Amino acid sequence: MVVLAVSIVNRGGKAIISRQFREMSRVRVESLLSSFPALVSEKSQNTTVESDNVRFVYQPLDELYIVLITNLQSNILQDIDTLHLLSQVVTSICSSLEEREILEYAFEIFTAFDEATSLGYRDNVSLTQIKTYLEMESHEEKIQEIVSRNKEIEATEERKRRIKQLELQKKEAARRAAQNLPSADAYESIGYQTVNTTFATSNVEDESAMESYHAAAKASSAPKAKGMQLGKKKNTSLLY
């Protein structure tokens, strides 16, 4: 048997979901499914119809149909058995067989279809095995979701920690810069010492000038020493 595609359609033949197992274009699948309702008779008890070199094996799901599209050489009994298995899978996954519910659980349904059929050939699996596999997949997805959420939380905490660390570094840098600047008292002390030094220098210069002036005055007022004059006659008198 070769299953070309499995689809869930409404009564008008519009595909809600469809899974192709062999190379078929979407247009081709939609064209085949749109012709399907016209081939189905409400009074007929048959679950197979044929058209355009393909066979439709179908089963009602309330207001919907689950349909296998197979080639004409496929084993009808095996196809019907596969169809029953897939319909049980759908009813076990979805709580109600409505279009909205089918779309909501489309991923799980596709996964179950792939477990039951490989490249169009029926795999030797039971409904229990498929459900177990789906539960394992769901459990792994939950674990992965938890791991991803924990990673996001850790990344958020790391960003907060880095922001806080940068703020502390900025505060520390500002504090050190403030400590290295001289205070107002230091500025006043430096100014006072400069003025005092200037005045002290001026006083020393004034005292040196006064000492030089007094020394010059004393030198000018002192009596001049007379030296010996040569060649000048002395006025002398002889006394007898």
UniProtKB/Swiss-Prot annotation:
Subunit-structure text: Oligomeric complex that consists of at least the alpha, beta, beta', gamma, delta, epsilon and zeta subunits.
GO process annotations (BP): endoplasmic reticulum to Golgi vesicle-mediated transport; intracellular protein transport; retrograde vesicle-mediated transport, Golgi to endoplasmic reticulum
Subcellular compartments: Cytoplasm; Nucleus
InterPro entries: AP_mu_sigma_su, Coatomer_dsu, Longin-like_dom_sf
Basic residues: compositionally biased ranges: 231-240
UniProt-listed SUPFAM superfamilies: SNARE-like (SSF64356)
Name of the protein described by the UniProt record: Coatomer subunit delta
Purpose: The coatomer is a cytosolic protein complex that binds to dilysine motifs and reversibly associates with Golgi non-clathrin-coated vesicles, which further mediate biosynthetic protein transport from the ER, via the Golgi up to the trans Golgi network. Coatomer complex is required for budding from Golgi membranes, and is essential for the retrograde Golgi-to-ER transport of dilysine-tagged proteins.
